[in-house]
Amino acid sequence: MHLESIVLRNFRNYENLELEFSPSVNVFLGENAQGKTNLLEAVLMLALAKSHRTTNDKDFIMWEKEEAKMEGRVVKRGQTVPLELAITQKGKRAKVNHLEQKKLSQYVGNLNVVIFAPEDLSLVKGAPGVRRRFLNMEIGQMQPIYLHNLSEYQRILQQRNQYLKMLQMKRKVDPMLLDILTEQFADVAINLTKRRADFIQKLEAYAAPIHHQISRGLETLKIEYKASVTLNGDDPEVWKADLLQKMESIKQREIDRGVTLIGPHRDDSLFYINGQNVQDFGSQGQQRTTALSVKLAEIDLIHEETGEYPVLLLDDVLSELDDYRQSHLLGAIEGKVQTFVTTTSTSGIDHNTLRQATTFYVEKGTVKKS
């Protein structure tokens, strides 16, 4: 799979831009604040209809314009698939093969991407929300139904929180409704939990040998999904019964707080090296090796799930890796993954990579191919 071309209209600082890409390595070179990351963000948006930088759609639309628009041609399995995404003040519209998609979950998955940015180095050390967003993004593009389930979960969670708030304020409401919402909540929560736990299991299977190799055989990586329920066995009904029991035990505390206290929105993923929690005890080098191993594992996992390698976006991250980790990253993707790199200088990039790369010079919203 690779992105053959992209067209941007009124997106960020690009009023009118058309680019054609190499199926191997593409380097966006320029000073800071010139628009390099905006280009990678456009590719990410074209793939996921979401950004790694903001959740506010208005941020994408150029000042005093009505909408931002992206078009791309994706080559997969020998066929070209046109994608279109328009962003307005009222929301997003998406097309595949020029046909409008009723839901964004039907659009996502036509272009698979893995992004590795400096903030991804905090995947291990950062707050649990960082890891939950990571799971939502990666599972969502491989299993579009997951995005539908996630949206349903967020809707029920919001309703349940509103109802708990009313009970907290001692308004006259039907107490039976909380039990109904809790039952609905548990059904969708277990669905998400199962998909996340399965994903983590597969991710570990790919990440562990990569980490073992990067650490020169000195470290063993384990990844655990820390769920609100006890993940005994494979029966979701058992998990659901456990969740309902726990929710019943904290019902009064939730009413007192006016918020749902357990569920996938509170779950986390834990990383262990040689049995030690990397979040708490890992060195910066171990945390970076773990993040790199996970990103490389994503590439292989997407390939297993979809039959195609994803597009890799490296947003100013090569300068954050030492020569050894950088060479391992570039060696792992060479010849099989279309890669987009942003950088302020080519001095930190492997010479073999540069020789096969197409370089674009970025300055004040203009892009010139070398």
Curated annotation (Swiss-Prot):
Residue positions binding ATP: G30, E31, N32, A33, Q34, G35, K36, T37
Database matches in Pfam families: SMC_N
PROSITE patterns for the chain: RECF_1, RECF_2
GO biological-process terms attached to the record: DNA replication; DNA synthesis involved in DNA repair; double-strand break repair; SOS response
UniProt keyword list: ATP-binding, Cytoplasm, DNA damage, DNA repair, DNA replication, DNA-binding, Nucleotide-binding, SOS response
One GO MF term: ATP binding
The keyword Coiled coil is annotated on this UniProt entry: no
Annotated localization: Cytoplasm
HAMAP family registered for this protein in UniProt: RecF
Function of the molecule: The RecF protein is involved in DNA metabolism; it is required for DNA replication and normal SOS inducibility. RecF binds preferentially to single-stranded, linear DNA. It also seems to bind ATP.
Name this protein carries in UniProt: DNA replication and repair protein RecF
Organism: Listeria innocua serovar 6a (strain ATCC BAA-680 / CLIP 11262)
Organism placement in taxonomy: Bacteria, Bacillati, Bacillota, Bacilli, Bacillales
UniProt gene name: recF
